[in-house]
């Protein structure tokens, strides 16, 4: 194998699994250490720069970081990265003074953002901090997009949204136009904006098409429309017996909301198997804990109604069968259909994009799925001054993806407004610093905690179900947060090897608790992976290979289950291993790496 | 500084016949200098005992004084241990073995401990054929007392500050062969592929098994001009054979060319298979081994591998005709048979 290329940050960035998996590349271990140190405000600010909505995301993030977390590969569960983020938000002190100031002197450029969801708000923040004048339009009365209209208050209190949206819209540079639905992109462009960002989300709920749907329409609701009405207070009650159709997170929010609005017998019914459901495991758990059964392999067949009133639904029983290509088909089992009586049905079977306000003759092209044609990196559309992000770009995703898109789109818009090539992206900001403090002393806590994941305390269920505004999760207190934070393995503190110093004594090989290090003859990767002290079977994790040893062998480190305990470096007589903190921040328009500071 | 090794381990860490992982055979974290060869030998012992699926409590580890003699704390944390007096491990171990022959005895010593102050004890243990594994972690210096030349230091070898050793070295391997050891090997801490099987073979050997393991002292004897440094040993290492230890009649695989393999079945059924690397070396001939050693030493080579093996050793208990039951399991009547029995013995000696 070729020696690992350390001239680019890729190898070490991938070692920080959580940060690599986070769409916005939040420097997770750094903020977790700050939480352990009680420096909540500092931890909050790291998050704020990276993901803009730490308090919101600390409660609602889809957390792609957690399945990626290294901890989950050396014991049962990953670090509770997401809920630690909330700890920073809950315990922080004043933060406004720490935020970069919005320049009083404007750069003369005007940008329009359609929608006030997380994608648009991120664009607005990043550009306003650079002196742009950003106009944000939303059909609703407040900012936040789906975070406000869809995510129920028992998961995300209004005050948190208000606070974090306020850090963007309330500091100047951003002009909000609420209760203002943009009806024409052409007209908007005609207003002379230097660029337009489209962050209008994926606002249309998929319809249910079965006999009886129209006749019983009064009691059949499209999930996202219903949730929005609940959020606005337009819907305050629901029938006693409720069926929720669908297996995604929207279905979970519908059923749990229904439980709080008078629903006593609420059930979720999905076509596919329980395991295949799109909802996150923790959302399913939360629903089931609230007494909501999830019934699977049932396909809606008919709506039953009497005198225009919904009475129940009929389902066909199916089972999964796999064809020769391994594709799954749902085929009827042949058993009799099942009927469930109900008073209301909530349809949460998917969301679609819709751009009725974008003219099709202005040069902005759509693909055959109705999505805009975009450059996946720059998010630029076929109209060079129109950019997309969030759910509007590639279909429904989640908040953290919307934020990540927002940062990238802001960089693109800034480059575009400067007349530069939007594909020439600024580099991330990277720092490497040795953590050595003494012979065997490190400036990070290298002891490895063996504690299992701590559960986040919940409010008493009786209280939770009484009022839809009561937040279910109480969050970790400081003590629990400290203990959970100690579970983090500090994957950003990298093991950096210097072959010139190595005397091949095997000290590091012998001490490594997880058998990561091998000195051996070089070979092709496939072969090398089988010859290591512990076979490196996890191909998603790279090998760190270094040559230049006296014996002509190579040092091979399987990064997979390294605990970052620093024992290799402690047992190395020559300092050939050093523990160096790798800090990476993606380029933001307003901060390090931005063209503004570089030129 | 870390005082504890995390208990988290590789998720695919294999278990042996007892269901234990290698990590279950470790001891406390080493306090030796980072990079000390002795730590590698500890790791090799852990590996060997784990591979043999020996229950840790069946092992007694004994040592003298020195960095090397400290190491039993760093392996087999669940075994019996006795850290004795400088150079006196052999007599303490002999006593222990006489009292309870059912344990597996592992003596760990240094070149100072065995070739300087303890030379007399070393010699007599070899002569008596105590059933044990005797490992000398040989670094050519008194590491613990800051690097004075020991008796195994080669003539002409330079100390860290430049002093040259003028005395002839003692070759413990030659001495062990001379004195009747029935399993004699030399190895290098930096070559676990060679060392681990040698330790396994020694542990299964039912007589006195001696391993001289060169083990660089990074603090005092790993410089230019030393003949016990990592670089010097790597350059001059001549392995005579590669050993594999089997417990079944695994057929000889294609990786061995015909005629190149010497097989020895030991008393406990273990099969030692040695792949010859040197034509003119026969590991079952004591005199030839001594000659071979002398010839190659004169050529400046450090000969390593299993140099001699007697598959049918006799041990101290065989010589003395002692009772097989450990003393702690004999009752009072058997241990103290009374004055009539004593009278009988005395009469026999008159
Ligand atoms: C029920 C439900 C629960 C969810 N829970 C989570 C969760 O827990 N965690 C998570 O990460 N994600 C969750 N999501 C997904 C998440 O809300 C979205 O992915 C995210 O909000 C997308 O952000 P966005 O900026 O693209 O647009 P959105 O948040 O969808 O905002 C778009 C905004 O644009 C406005 N708009 C649309 N068209 C126009 C127009 N023509 N003129 C003016 N304004 C317009 C809309 O009113 C809306 O406010 C959930 C989604 C749903 C439906
Ligand atoms: C009776 C006695 N004499 C001297 C000493 C001092 N002493 C301690 S260790 C040692 C030498 C150890 O050398 P070696 O056995 O080679 O061990 P190493 O430290 O090199 O591994 C000496 C002389 C002692 N502890 N006891
Ligand atoms: S252990 Fe910590 S640094 Fe490592 S992946 Fe998990 S959260 Fe990130
Ligand atoms: S401990 Fe240091 S000198 Fe020894 S093998 Fe490892 S890296 Fe090389
Ligand atoms: S002094 Fe030498 S023998 Fe002792 S621990 Fe240090 S390196 Fe090892
Ligand atoms: Mg010594």
List PLM regions with ranges.
Chain B
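Conserved active-site and cofactor/substrate-binding residues in soluble primary-metabolism enzymes
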Residues: 39-44, 56, 87, 91, ...
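Short coil/turn connectors at secondary-structure junctions
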Residues: 28, 55-59, 78-80, 99-105, ...
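Glycine-rich ThDP/TPP pyrophosphate-binding loop and its adjacent helix/strand module
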Residues: 116-117, 121-132, 137, 141-283
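Flexible, low-complexity linker and terminal segments
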Residues: 2-18, 219-350
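Short catalytic-loop micro-motif centered on adjacent basic/acidic residues
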Residues: 34, 107-109, 183-188
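Thiamine diphosphate
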Residues: 1-143, 196-197, 325, 329-350
């Amino acid at each position: 194998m070729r020696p690992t290329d350390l001239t680019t940050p890729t190898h070490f960035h991938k070692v920080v699994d959580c940060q690599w998996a986070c769409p916005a590349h939040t420097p997770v271990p750094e903020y977790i250490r700050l939480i352990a140190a009680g420096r909540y405000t500092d931890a909050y600010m790291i998050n704020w720069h990276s993901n803009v909505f730490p308090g919101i995301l600390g409660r609602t993030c889809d957390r792609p970081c957690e399945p990626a977390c290294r901890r989950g590969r050396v014991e049962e569960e990953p670090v509770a990265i997401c809920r630690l983020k909330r700890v920073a938000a809950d315990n922080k002190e004043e933060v406004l003074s720490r935020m970069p100031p919005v320049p009083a002197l404007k750069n003369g450029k005007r940008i329009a953002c359609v929608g006030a969801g997380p994608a648009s708000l991120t664009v607005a923040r990043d550009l306003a901090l650079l002196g742009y004048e950003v106009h944000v339009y939303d059909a609703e009365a407040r900012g936040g997009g789906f975070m406000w209209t869809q995510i129920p208050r028992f998961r995300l209190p209004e005050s948190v949204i208000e606070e974090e949206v306020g850090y963007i819209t309330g500091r100047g540079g951003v002009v909000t136009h609420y209760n203002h639905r943009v009806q024409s992109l052409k007209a908007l462009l005609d207003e002379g904006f230097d660029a337009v960002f489209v962050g209008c989300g994926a606002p249309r709920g998929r319809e249910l098409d079965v006999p009886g749907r129209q006749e019983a329409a009064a009691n059949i609701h499209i999930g996202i429309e219903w949730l929005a009405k609940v959020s606005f207070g337009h819907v305050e009650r629901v029938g006693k017996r409720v069926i929720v159709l669908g297996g995604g997170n929207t279905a979970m929010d519908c059923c749990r909301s229904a439980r709080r609005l008078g629903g006593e017998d609420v059930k979720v019914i999905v076509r596919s198997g329980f395991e295949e459901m799109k909802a996150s495991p923790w959302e399913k758990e939360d629903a089931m804990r609230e007494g909501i059964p999830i019934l699977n392999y049932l396909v809606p067949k008919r709506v039953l109604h009497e005198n225009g009133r919904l009475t129940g639904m009929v389902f066909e029983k199916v089972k999964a069968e796999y064809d020769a290509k391994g594709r799954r088909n749902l085929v009827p089992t042949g058993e009799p259909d099942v009927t469930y009586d109900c008073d209301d049905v909530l349809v949460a079977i998917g969301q679609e994009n819709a751009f009725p306000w974008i003219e099709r003759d202005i040069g902005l092209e759509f693909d055959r799925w109705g999505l805009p044609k975009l450059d996946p990196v720059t998010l630029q559309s076929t109209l060079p001054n129109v950019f997309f992000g969030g759910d509007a770009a590639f279909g429904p995703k989640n908040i953290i993806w919307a934020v990540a898109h927002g940062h990238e789109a802001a960089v693109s818009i800034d480059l575009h407004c400067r007349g530069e090539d939007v594909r020439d992206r600024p580099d991330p900001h990277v720092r490497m610093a040795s953590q050595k403090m003494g012979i065997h002393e490190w400036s990070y806590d290298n002891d490895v905690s063996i504690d299992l994941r701590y559960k986040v305390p919940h409010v008493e269920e009786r209280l939770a179900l009484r009022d839809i505004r009561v937040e279910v999760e109480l969050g970790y207190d400081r003590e629990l947060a400290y203990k959970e934070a100690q579970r983090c393995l500090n994957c950003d503190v990298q093991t950096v090897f210097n072959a010139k110093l190595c005397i091949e004594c095997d000290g590091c090989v012998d001490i490594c608790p997880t058998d990561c290090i091998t000195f051996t003859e070089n070979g092709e990767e496939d072969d090398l992976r089988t010859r290591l002290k512990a076979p490196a079977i996890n191909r998603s994790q790279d090998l760190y290979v270094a040559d230049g040893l006296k014996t002509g062998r190579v040092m091979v480190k399987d990064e997979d289950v390294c605990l970052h305990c620093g024992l290799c470096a402690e047992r190395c007589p020559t300092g050939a291993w050093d523990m160096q903190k790798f800090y990476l921040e993606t380029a933001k328009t307003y901060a390090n790496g931005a063209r503004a500071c570089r030129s | 500084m870390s005082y504890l090794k995390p208990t988290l381990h590789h998720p695919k860490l294999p278990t042996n016949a007892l269901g234990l992982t290698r990590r279950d055979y470790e001891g406390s974290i080493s306090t030796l200098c980072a990079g000390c060869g002795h730590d590698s030998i500890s790791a090799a012992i852990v590996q060997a005992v784990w591979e043999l699926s020996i229950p840790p409590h069946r092992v007694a580890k004994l040592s003298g004084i020195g960095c090397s003699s400290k190491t039993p704390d760093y392996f087999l944390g669940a075994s019996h241990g006795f850290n004795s007096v400088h150079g006196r491990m052999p007599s303490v171990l002999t006593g222990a073995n006489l009292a309870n022959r059912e344990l597996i005895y592992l003596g760990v010593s240094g070149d100072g401990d065995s070739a300087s102050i303890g030379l007399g004890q070393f010699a007599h243990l070899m002569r008596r054929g105590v059933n044990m594994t005797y490992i000398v972690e040989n670094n050519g210096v008194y590491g613990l007392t800051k690097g004075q030349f020991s008796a195994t230091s080669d003539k002409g070898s330079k100390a860290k500050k430049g002093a040259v050793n003028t005395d002839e070295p003692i070759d413990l391997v030659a001495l062990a062969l001379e004195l009747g050891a029935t399993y004699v090997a030399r190895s290098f801490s930096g070559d676990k592929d060679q060392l681990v099987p040698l330790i396994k073979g020694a542990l299964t050997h039912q007589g006195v098994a001696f391993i001289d393991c060169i083990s660089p002292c990074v603090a005092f004897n790993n410089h230019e001009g030393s003949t016990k440094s990592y670089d010097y040993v790597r350059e001059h290492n001549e392995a005579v054979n590669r050993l594999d230890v089997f417990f079944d009649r695994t057929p000889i695989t294609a990786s061995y060319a015909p005629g190149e393999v010497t097989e020895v079945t030991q008393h406990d059924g273990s099969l030692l298979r040695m792949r010859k690397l040197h034509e003119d070396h026969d590991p079952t001939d004591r005199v030839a081994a001594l000659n071979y050693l002398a010839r190659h030493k004169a050529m400046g080579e450090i000969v390593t591998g299993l140099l001699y093996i007697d598959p049918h050793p006799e041990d101290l208990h065989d010589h003395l005709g002692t009772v097989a039951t450990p003393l702690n399991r004999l009752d009072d009547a058997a241990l103290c048979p009374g004055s009539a029995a004593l009278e009988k013995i005395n009469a026999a000696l008159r």
